[in-house]
């Protein structure tokens, strides 16, 4: 019987028949997905086949060039059909503002992807939760408690502690080529685990492993999400099994963390909280027990687990990518590197190290970060919105359930907005108040409107702190005698906009700082 089962599931005949069945089924679904008569959709190419015209080599530039070429032909509002997916691509700041402001409620939902449904406990996190009362209340908790300015300030001690560990690690390897990304990820995972669930976390390795795996599985548009009515697709592809097994490991750790904290609170109800216990988990447990600021709003264990995991997931890869691009651009432009280092070392003159409290004083560092996310946004295509109802814009119909995707990469390099759009010029932000908090639509790398990222302050504080620490403590050079103009700046589209080849640099301890 075992041999028969193994043969039936793995034999070439079974795989061939399954593939033929799948192709026939998907093509039938694509043919059957008709456009309503009398509706004028935004212009766009004909329906794209299952693989079709989309670039398949995984290169970021291939996908972006493909979309930008289409936008030049069809305009800033463009319609694509990919499988069962109806997608509207927005490629201008003006139209992004109209969509996200004027029609904000209509596009306030998120598509329910396979990864989010499983790994976020049926999309309970703030990123993918359906628009409604739950999401509104959750965003308020983020703004007022979880990631408020006061809370972020309270995390400075944790940031400083983990940053010191990272700096010590780099100092032990001076003179040797190192991958900067690896050092940053170690810092970010350690800092985020402490900020979310406290210093005592026996399952930290599992949390990190699950975050890495989930990021990898979310790195591209998946065929399972292009044909949502074919429920068997995630099973055939093996995605459902992989995610389910991953969630089991993650869930055990998160349940243990919650249980341990609840037992401690019950056994010592009157004892003041330690610093690391004034974390995000502590805030969420208040809402589980009806002791939050809004006593009517309650969360379950699944809510807490989804929120905690999402916070760890969202705060690592994007932050590391931003700093890596900042350092890449500065190494490519030595005069800008000197200017940034001079500012940091002048502001911190007389100090031996940098702290979270220092980043607010570093104006040029902030400009470097803004310019970096303009050119190399952490999400070149912003998280898709899903239309809650049909509506019209410029006489064109945006269908219900269609995905609305903001092509921020195109906006960030639009020559109508940005002079010398392809050139790295932090000074362009010196005489204006443009920020990336969602009100300036020419700079929305973290989204805008009702689904703007609630963790911008926390994320940018970490980014600015990491970048300033690298500039303050170390001098840097490219390996192998490489010249600045020889440094490749190739981008790769995956879970975000990352370097195709990780940035490798050689650090040396700054004699200016050490001599203070």
UniProtKB/Swiss-Prot annotation:
GO molecular function, one term: oxidoreductase activity, acting on paired donors, with incorporation or reduction of molecular oxygen, reduced flavin or flavoprotein as one donor, and incorporation of one atom of oxygen
A family per Pfam: p450
Cellular component, GO annotation: endoplasmic reticulum membrane
Keyword Acetylation: no
Tissue note: Highly expressed in stems. Expressed at low levels in roots.
Binding sites annotated in the UniProt record for heme: 453
Topology in the lipid bilayer: Single-pass type II membrane protein
Membrane spanning stretches: 6-26
Catalytic reaction annotation: tetrahydroalstonine + A + reduced [NADPH--hemoprotein reductase] + O2 = alstonine + AH2 + oxidized [NADPH--hemoprotein reductase] + 2 H2O + H(+); ajmalicine + A + reduced [NADPH--hemoprotein reductase] + O2 = serpentine + AH2 + oxidized [NADPH--hemoprotein reductase] + 2 H2O + H(+)
PANTHER family: CYTOCHROME P450 71AV8-LIKE, OS08G0105600 PROTEIN
Protein name as annotated: Alstonine synthase
Gene (name only): CYP71AY1
